[in-house]
Amino acid sequence: TDKLIFGKGTRVTVEP
């Protein structure tokens, strides 16, 4: 599970 932080400050959890 990788947490990506975008410039919008939104945390998204992505599971490949």
Curated annotation (Swiss-Prot):
GO biological process terms, alphabetically, are: adaptive immune response
Supply one GO CC term from the record: T cell receptor complex
Q: Which top-rank group of organisms is this from? A: Eukaryota
Q: Which UniProt keywords apply?
A: Adaptive immunity, Cell membrane, Immunity, Membrane, Receptor, T cell receptor
Query: Cystine bridges: which residues?
Result: none
Task: Determine if Membrane is one of this entry's keywords.
Answer: yes
Membrane-spanning segments: none
- Where in the cell does this protein reside? Cell membrane
Q: What does this protein do?
A: J region of the variable domain of T cell receptor (TR) delta chain that participates in the antigen recognition. Gamma-delta TRs recognize a variety of self and foreign non-peptide antigens frequently expressed at the epithelial boundaries between the host and external environment, including endogenous lipids presented by MH-like protein CD1D and phosphoantigens presented by butyrophilin-like molecule BTN3A1. Upon antigen recognition induces rapid, innate-like immune responses involved in pathogen clearance and tissue repair.
Complex formation = Gamma-delta TR is a heterodimer composed of a gamma and delta chain; disulfide-linked. The gamma-delta TR is associated with the transmembrane signaling CD3 coreceptor proteins following the stoichiometry: a single gamma-delta TR heterodimer associates with one CD3D-CD3E heterodimer, one CD3G-CD3E heterodimer and one CD247 homodimer forming a stable octameric structure. Upon activation, gamma-delta TR complex associates with FCER1G to initiate intracellular signaling.
For this entry, the protein name equals T cell receptor delta joining 1
Which lineage do the record's taxonomy fields give for this organism? Eukaryota, Metazoa, Chordata, Craniata, Vertebrata
